[in-house]
Amino acid sequence: MIASLSVEAERELIDAANYYAEHAGPDLGLAFIAEFERALAVLCDHPHLGPVWRGKSRRFPLRRFPYSVIYRLRIDELYVVALAHQRRRPT
């Protein structure tokens, strides 16, 4: 299964990685991206792992960071809708 990101999810990923890099050092920004990539690899291998959340979307929390991958399953595609902070309300 392949993964793709919405424009919004890509922006959220970059913004969060930049925030960690600026406030805690570049290594943490890179660690955030690596954790996101690890989560995508797990989800591509096991797409039903995340529980259903808000209709047809699914939610999978990152291990080391307070973010969740919000995604939808399409035919042979895992589409990332958002990268949501777990303590903020979605807009």
Predicted regions and their residues:
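A short, glycine/Asx- and small/polar-enriched loop/turn
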Residues: 63-65
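Short Gly/Pro-enriched turn/cap motifs at secondary-structure boundaries
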Residues: 59-61
